Amino acid sequence: MYVEIVQDHNRQVWDERVRKGLLHTRVASDDEFKNPLKAINGRGWITGGLEGKHVLCLAGGGGLQAPLYAAAGAHVTVVDISQEMINQDNRIAQERGLKLKALVGSMDDLSMIENDSFDLVTQPVSTCYIPNLLKVYDEISRVLRVGGHYLSQHKQPINLQSAPTPYPNGYAVTQSYYDKGPLPP
């Protein structure tokens, strides 16, 4: 029961964020589509290119990541809890003539996907919205092929209260971690 309440809440919030055009709901830009591999792999974590690879964008709906992976030559499936985020993926794919499979679902239940289906599972910051991470990782392990890669982003409290400024040898935190005020917008 608790899991369903959390999922319903998350679904409603993300659907509303899309309708309002809020942060983390933007679609890929024309500039990003000029070099989609660079746009999604700016740090060089993905090696060997994406042409012909099977990629799962887990909790990665919204018209940004999945269309860029498809434009870079991957066979893409995107799973997101938000119908509105999935709608954006479908719209951008149609506008750009891209093929992708977009599914509404939770990252902790990928029963609609066969075992050993993907060479790469990519996941933006999203595990913070799930009550039971073991189910998520069990599902990722099940759908990822032997030798495949899992690329996941995570947050910690300092990420939510700081603005890193890049320098040649690292980053400077420009807002105190111990700021007693509300989190920045």
Placement of each model-derived feature along the sequence:
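A short SAM/SAH-binding and catalytic strip from SAM-dependent methyltransferases
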Residues: 119-134
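Hydrophobic residues in well-ordered beta-strands that form the structural core
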Residues: 78, 122, 152-154
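Conserved class I S-adenosyl-L-methionine
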Residues: 1-51, 64-65, 92, 149-184
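Nucleotide donor/acceptor-binding cores
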Residues: 52-54, 116
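A short acidic, Gly/Pro-enriched loop at the edge of an enzyme's catalytic core
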Residues: 111-121
